[in-house]
Amino acid sequence: MAGKQTIKSQASKLSEPDVIVDFVFDDGLLFIAISNLSDKPAYKVSITFDQEIHGLDGKDICALPLFRNIEFLAPHKTITTLLDSSGSYFSREESTRISACITHHDFQGTKKVATINHDLEIYREIGFVRRPNTQD
C-alpha cells in the first residue's frame, strides 16, 4: 500500500496540465465540456474538430470563440456549452464520430497536443425522463 501512495504523490508533483474535451449527456441534452483535470493551470487552450458540429438552430458550434482560444484554464476547471437536445441532434443525422484535437501550453510555454475520439452514437438510445420544473 505504501508503494501506491509514493507513486501517487510523485505523479502529483510532476503533474502538468491535462486538458480534455468531452461530450456529456444529461436529461436528454448534449453538452460539450472542456476540462483541465490536473493540479496545474493550462494556457492558450484551443480545440479543433475534424468536422463541423451543428447545434441549436443549425449553428456551427466549432466556430465559437470558446474553442479558438482560452487564455487561462484553471486547475480542475470545466467550461461547458450546450450542443443541442439529443433528439434534435440525432434527427438531423449529424455525424456521431467526432475527433477533437486539443492544444495547450504549460506555465513554461511547453506545447502539448492530444486528440480524443468520440462516438456520440452511445447516447442515441439512452432513455431519460424530463423532470417537471420545481420551485423551492
Task: List PLM regions with ranges.
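A short beta-turn/strand-edge loop motif at beta-sheet boundaries
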Residues: 39-44, 92
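Serine/threonine-enriched low-complexity regions used as flexible
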Residues: 93-106
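Hydrophobic beta-strand positions in extracellular immunoglobulin-like domains
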Residues: 34-36, 85, 104
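Acidic, serine/threonine- and proline-rich intrinsically disordered appendage/tail regions
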Residues: 18-22, 33, 107-136
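Intrinsically disordered, low-complexity Pro/Gly/Ser/Thr-rich segments with frequent PxxP/GP/PP motifs
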Residues: 55-90
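Membrane-proximal alpha-helical anchors
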Residues: 1-40, 50-52
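Surface-exposed coil/turn segments at beta-strand junctions on protein surfaces, enriched
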Residues: 25, 74, 93-95
